[in-house]
Amino acid sequence: ASALMKNFNISAEEAYGLIATGAQNGADKNGDLLDTLNEYSAQFAALGLSADQFMGSLVEGADAGLFSIDKVADAVKEFNIRAKDGSDSSAEAFKGLGLNSDKMFAAFAAGGETAQAAFFDTVEALNKLEDPLKRNEIGVALFGSQFEDLEAGILPVLGDIETAAYDGAAALQQINDV
């Protein structure tokens, strides 16, 4: 809970509510929810994503039957690193999506809502690629080997992060009522 509180500036009640919600919705099916939250919350926060969106991506990944929620979070971590590294391979990947790499690097370096908007622009552009080989090549260039491991299953999960919202307070109240 402390990693959620620190990285997303939320209360203990909100953090525990999100943990309860995630567990109730299948995100702990492999027993790695708490480790995943601790390890990757800073990466999601750096992209301007909320704690709700972080948990939503994990629940969506579990719902989609992806191998492990850790892989979903690790793909976002790899993206966060590559989206800021200024490397030729990242620049080429952004260009392959029809995005201006200099603007994308600047947006991710800025963080917050600017990074969040750039993240969703990237995911949307990747989702629109019709050529599966090109989509995989660019996906791996930006999200690392986790993209390859999760294949096309990760794209709907990443695309749904934007609208993910889980009522952690309601989940915590249900636990308290028992």
Model-predicted segments: where are they?
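Amphipathic/coiled-coil alpha-helical interface segments used
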Residues: 2-5, 9-178
